[in-house]
Amino acid sequence: MTFSVCFIERREGGSPSIERVFRAVADELSSQKIGTRFVSVPYGNGILGIFLNLLLFRPPQADILHIAGHVNYLGLTMPRANTVSTIHDLTILDLRSGFRRWLIEKLFFVWPSRRLRYLTAISKATQTRLIQSAGIPEEKVRVIENPLLIASSPKQAFSETDPIVLQVGTAPNKNVERLIEAVSGLPCRLHIVGKLSVHEERRIRELNISLIHDETLDDAGIEKAYRDADIVTLCSTDEGFGLPIIEGQANGALVITSDRSPMKEVAGGGAILVDPEDVDSIKNGISAALSDSEMRTNTIEIGRQNVHRFDRAEIARQYLSLYNEILRNLEGNRSK
């Protein structure tokens, strides 16, 4: 069946991995002769921007409309019968309090999730939190995980003399302050991709940490960063999924991540798990990665096998199955 899908995105974002996810899905769909296009809302995600988007944004004509993430409030105005909304995480709620938190929870998650018929979450953890927040049944939210976005390029050898620890992302949930404390005194270089706060920059200088810093990288730069990394850290306090886990595994790096959902499930046994709120736990994990070559080799190999389940063709197939279900339901309603 030939049909068209329109992916709807935010105007700008601090987490480009979300946009990369659905471009990978769209590439797979296009190879099957399914029409895809992307449109962005005209305004940002401030309170005024949200209400202007709700008032003024109208999606182009398409068989399937897919709210691709972090503009989930559009589910309040989009047609229910052929709209899918993907929820990546609810981390924004942890960064707000009082009336602002209440309003964001209602606009982004509660009201649109109750109104729309088709919802997906990128992990079981996000699904669980969404159904608790919105008060909706579990069967309404389909879990479709994120695909691996970069090509697998296994590292030739772990650098014993000058290992690089890669951290992609510096949002508050990424736990960079504790990571900085944890690498202090360890024989490694820290490569951070993302904007650092004044406090983080000062702390890096005070601790005399050897730093590689890139505020932003294009896709080629990200791929090179993973190829160069010996260790990839994602010791976040909270995640919707955790793409750096599988991106590190695909490139033969040893991954260190949090012993929390969904990160430990995404890692599939191919990572060192640490307590993200304990600097010593993170430091011990990095120290073990640097010193225990047998454990390192075994963990990297488990990670290499783990990434196969995130093949982009398989993830696209799951979205295609959902789209076909929506179209069948539409056809059934027309024939009544």
Predicted regions and their residues:
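Nucleotide-activated donor-binding/catalytic signature segment of Leloir-type glycosyltransferases, i.e.
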Residues: 194, 200-223
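Conserved donor-binding/catalytic core segment of Leloir-type glycosyltransferases
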Residues: 158-174, 180-185, 191
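Aromatic "clamp/platform" in nucleotide-sugar-dependent glycosyltransferases that forms part
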Residues: 235-237
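A short, well-ordered alpha-helix in the C-terminal region of glycosyltransferases
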Residues: 295-309, 318-321
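Conserved acidic donor-binding segment of nucleotide-sugar-dependent glycosyltransferases
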Residues: 258, 272-280, 287-294
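Membrane-proximal helix-turn-helix segments that form the acceptor-binding/catalytic region
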Residues: 99-119
